[in-house]
Amino acid sequence: MPLLFLERFPWPSLRTYTGLSGLALLGTIVSAYRALSQPEDGSGEPEPLTAPLQPEALAPARLTAGGPRARDVAQYLLSDSLFVWVLVNTACCVLMLVAKLIQCIVFGPLRVSERQHLKDKFWNFIFYKFIFIFGVLNVQTVEEVVMWCLWFAGLVFLHLMVQLCKDRFEYLSFSPTTPMSSHGRVLSLLIAMLLSCCGLAVVCCVTGYTHGMHTLAFMAAESLLVTVRTAHVILRYVIHLWDLNHEGTWEGKGTYVYYTDFVMELALLSLDLMHHIHMLLFGNIWLSMASLVIFMQLRYLFHEVQRRIRRHKNYLRVVGNMEARFAVATPEELAVNNDDCAICWDSMQAARKLPCGHLFHNSCLRSWLEQDTSCPTCRMSLNIADGSRAREDHQGENLDENLVPVAAAEGRPRLNQHNHFFHFDGSRIASWLPSFSVEVMHTTNILGITQASNSQLNAMAHQIQEMFPQVPYHLVLQDLQMTRSVEITTDNILEGRIQVPFPTQRSDSLRPALNSPVERPSPDLEEGEASVQTERVPLDLSPRLEETLDFSEVELEPIEVEDFEARGSRFSKSADERQRMLVQRKDDLLQQARKRFLNKSSEDDGASERLLPSEGTSSDPVTLRRRMLAAAAERRLQRQRTT
C-alpha cells in the first residue's frame, strides 16, 4: 500500500480529533467576529483568495447596531486563506462522525478484514487524488484546491461506505442464521448511497457548466465509478434475497450472479480505464512522476480487462462442453441415487450426470469445471480441455518434469532441472506497482553435474538406509552418486529400479564358515610328497555352537558397511574430510596388518599340528571342533586387546 508510513503514524482517536476540530472552528469564528467588529482601519482585512472583497461591501455590516451577522462571518472565513482550511477540516470531521453513526446503527463492531479493507481503500484514494490534484490538474489557486478537496471528501465517504456494505454482504450471505433485519439495514444504506450518487450527478452538471467540459468529465467519471459499485452491490443483494425467499433450490442463481459480476466489473474497469486515459491526455504530463503512476495504473487496468475477458471465454467454453458432453439426469436416476450434491451438500431436484456416474447441480458443476476438469468425487479426468488449455497443461507437465524424475530408456532416472521461480506481486503493496517474475534455470547433466561432497553422500545414504534397511548400503550409494537427491533415490527404491537382493544373500556371504566344507590337511609322510591333499568333512554345528559363532557376523557387518562408504578425494577441499580420510587409511592399514599376523599365526599352528605324532587325535572330528573354537576365541581376544 502506498504511504505505508502513514499507517504507523500515531493518529489521534476520533474523540480527540473531534475535540481539536471543534476548538479550531471556535477559535476561527471568534477571530472572524473580532475582526469584523473592529472599526474599519484596513489592518484587519483578511487575505483574499482571488478577488478581495471591497471594504465598502463590509462597512455596512460593521456599522449595524447588532454587529456582524452569521453570513458575514461565514463570508469572512471563506475569504481567508488560512481559515478556509479549518472549514474543510470541519467538513471532514462531520463526515467522520456521520460514518461512525452509520457504523453503530447499521454494522455494529467491524471485523478485522473490514477494517483492513477500509484502510487500504482510504490511503489508496488519498494517494491517487493527491497526484490528480497537483500532478494532473496542476491547480494554481486556493479556491480550486478547496473545491476539489471537498469534492473528494464526499467521494471517499461514499466509497468507504460502499466497500463496507460489500464486505458485510459477503459475510452475511454465507451466514445461515442471519436475521432479515440485518439485511434490511444494509440494503437501506445502499439505497441511500445510490440516492447520494444521484445528488453527486447534479453537482457535476452544475459545476461542470461553470468550469468547462474537462472538469465535468473528471467529476462525472468519479461519480459514475461510485454509482456502478453501489449498483453492483445492490443487484447482488437483490439476487441473494430472492434466493432466500425462493422455495427449493434456484438453479439459475449462478448464471445471474455471474453475468451481474461480469457486466458490472467490465463496466467499472472500462470507466476507470477511460478516466485514466483522459487524465494522461489532459495533463500533458509525459515526463513527470505523475505520468509514471498513471501509466502503471493504465497497465494494471488493461491487464484486468484482458483477464476478465479470458475468464468469460473460459466460462463459455465450460458451459458449452458441459451441455454437450454431460446429459441431464433423469428423475429415475435421481431417485436411484437419492443423494445430495457433493459440492454444495444440498438436495438435487435437477442434476447433470458425469461419465463416472456421479451427479451434481448444474451451477455447482459449472463452477467446479472452471477450476478443475476432473470429477469432484472420484477425480476421474473429464477431458474437456480445448487446444489452449491442452497447451497450458502440456506446459504444466513440462514444468513438473523439471521437478519430478522420469525414467529413461535404460531404467535409470533422468536427471532433473532445478528451476527457481521468483514472483513479485506489486498489487499487494499498491495497485500501481508493477508485478514481475524471474525464473532461474540450472540445467544439470552427467558431464556438468556439480560434485557433491562425499560426506553429504554418506549422510544421505545413511538417511535412506534408515527408511529402507533391507537395501544394501553400496546400492544406495551408487544410486546417490547418479541422482544426487534423496527424493529421487527413494522413488527409485519404491518403484523397483534398484534391484534389492534377497535377505539370505548377505547372511550367506557373511557366514562362509558355517555353510562351506572344512578342508582338513592329510599329509602323507611315508611317501614324502610335498603336495597336500585335502579332504572335505561337513561341519555340523549344534545350535549352541552357532550362537557362539554369531560374534563373527556381528563384527563383520560394520566392516563390510565401512568398505562401501565413499571415500573422499585425496585433493578434497574440506580440511575435516582430509583428516577423516587420513585416519581411515591408518585404521585400514592397522586392520590389514592384524589380519596378516593372525593368518600367519594360524598357519604356524596348523603346521605344528600336522607334525604331531598322534594320528588318532588329528583325525578326530571332535578334536578339530575344539581346536577351531579355541582358535576363534583366541582371535577374538586379540582383536579386543588391539581395539
Swiss-Prot record:
Residues 456-498 form the CUE domain. Residues 622-640 are annotated as: VCP/p97-interacting motif (VIM). Palmitoylation of the RING-type zing finger by ZDHHC6 promotes localization to the peripheral endoplasmic reticulum. It is an enzyme of class 2 (transferase). The keyword Signal does not apply. Expressed in heart, brain, liver, lung, skeletal muscle, kidney and testis. Not detected in spleen. Pathway: Protein modification; protein ubiquitination. It is a multi-pass membrane protein. A zinc finger (RING-type) spans 341-379. The modification Phosphoserine is found at S516, S542. InterPro entries: AMFR_Ube2g2-bd (IPR040675), CUE (IPR003892), Znf_RING (IPR001841), Znf_RING/FYVE/PHD (IPR013083). Pfam families: CUE, G2BR, zf-RING_2. Keywords: Endoplasmic reticulum, Lipoprotein, Membrane, Metal-binding, Nucleotide-binding, Palmitate, Phosphoprotein, Receptor, Transferase, Transmembrane, Transmembrane helix, Ubl conjugation pathway, Wnt signaling pathway, Zinc, Zinc-finger. GO terms for biological process: endoplasmic reticulum unfolded protein response; ERAD pathway; learning or memory; negative regulation of canonical Wnt signaling pathway; non-canonical NF-kappaB signal transduction; protein autoubiquitination; protein K27-linked ubiquitination; protein K48-linked ubiquitination. Disruption phenotype: Mice with a conditional deletion in the liver display improved hyperlipidemia and insulin resistance: mice show elevated energy expenditure and are resistant to diet-induced obesity and glucose intolerance. Increased stability of Hmgcr, Insig1 and Insig2 and suppression of the SREBP pathway and novo lipid biosynthesis. GO terms for cellular component: dendrite; Derlin-1 retrotranslocation complex; endoplasmic reticulum; endoplasmic reticulum membrane; Golgi apparatus; growth cone; neuronal cell body; perinuclear region of cytoplasm. Residues 504-535, 598-624 are annotated as: Disordered. Its EC number is 2.3.2.36. The CUE domain is required for recognition of misfolded proteins such as mutant CFTR. E3 ubiquitin-protein ligase that mediates the polyubiquitination of lysine and cysteine residues on target proteins, such as CD3D, CYP3A4, CFTR, INSIG1, SOAT2/ACAT2 and APOB for proteasomal degradation. Component of a VCP/p97-AMFR/gp78 complex that participates in the final step of endoplasmic reticulum-associated degradation (ERAD). The VCP/p97-AMFR/gp78 complex is involved in the sterol-accelerated ERAD degradation of HMGCR through binding to the HMGCR-INSIG1 complex at the ER membrane. Interacts with RNF5. Also forms an ERAD complex containing VCP/p97, NGLY1; PSMC1; SAKS1 and RAD23B required for coupling retrotranslocation, ubiquitination and deglycosylation. Interacts with DERL1. Interacts (through a region distinct from the RING finger) with UBE2G2/UBC7. Component of the VCP/p97-AMFR/gp78 complex that enhances VCP/p97 binding to polyubiquitinated proteins for their degradation by the endoplasmic reticulum-associated degradation (ERAD) pathway. Interacts (via the VIM) with VCP/p97. This is E3 ubiquitin-protein ligase AMFR.
